[in-house]
Amino acid sequence: PAYNVPEEGRVVVNITVNPAGVVIGTSINPQTNTVNSTLRKAAEDAAKKARFNTVEGPNNQTGTITYYFNLR
């Protein structure tokens, strides 16, 4: 994800995905190692844009996405 702060870190985002493959919920996982709100928001925004394969059935799926922010 794009970000404009001179910091590095790992942001782990919990996601809930509906059967259509759309992310319908996000939250920051405790395994995140940065308190920087800009990095956290960038990761959550990117997770909300993610799309997954559709699945049969009415149940939502849960999981995590890990984003690594590195300075270059």
Enumerate the predicted regions with their spans.
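Short, low-complexity, Pro/Ser/Thr/Gly-rich segments in the mature regions of secreted, periplasmic
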Residues: 64-71
